[in-house]
Design a protein with these regions (language model features):
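Non-heme Fe(II) oxygenase metal-center motifs and adjacent flexible, charged/small-residue loops
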Residues: 1-151
Length: 151
């Protein structure tokens, strides 16, 4: 399966700082979207990505991306089965902050992966382009940072 998972990609202190930045960035955002609580986007024709990049850990610059989506999931929230837009590149990177999460790949057989605080998940190939993925309801507050590139 073309998936790479790094469970402790960020330190506990980096997670705490970044979760605080996520909360600050979402203050005033009221839009609820598709099972998530709040969403904010940078890059492409969204908000200025470079403005926020100055505040996130240097190691994020190692990820090849030109767009970033910040998702907030309060307890019980999730994102339903979907395939990310084909307008994005072949590989997607997800950093998980806060409570644990279970990502589900709706393949045969179904694959589940637990995502911990500070973990980095990347997936590509058929998992990216033809197999739907979702998350199970969050047991507590969680943020995800989704890094993508244009095709």
């Amino acid at each position: 399966m073309p998936i790479e998972y790094k469970p402790y990609w960020l330190s506990v202190s980096e997670c705490a700082v970044l979760a605080g930045e996520c909360k600050r960035e979402l203050d005033g955002v009221v839009k609820k979207a598709n099972g998530r609580t709040r969403v904010k986007r940078w890059g492409w024709d969204y908000l200025d990505l470079e403005r926020w990049l100055g505040e996130i850990p240097e190691k994020f610059r190692l990820i090849p991306f030109d767009s970033l989506t910040l998702n907030e999931y309060e307890e019980g929230r999730f994102i339903g089965p979907h395939i990310d837009s084909m307008g994005y590149g072949d590989r997607i990177f997800v950093v998980s902050l806060g409570g644990p999460a279970t990502i589900v790949f709706h393949s045969e057989p179904v694959e589940r992966l637990q995502l911990g605080n500070g973990s980095l998940l990347s997936f590509w190939g058929k998992e990216r382009t033809s197999i739907k993925h979702s998350t199970e309801p969050s047991p507590g507050l969680r943020y995800s940072l989704v890094f993508r590139n244009k095709r």
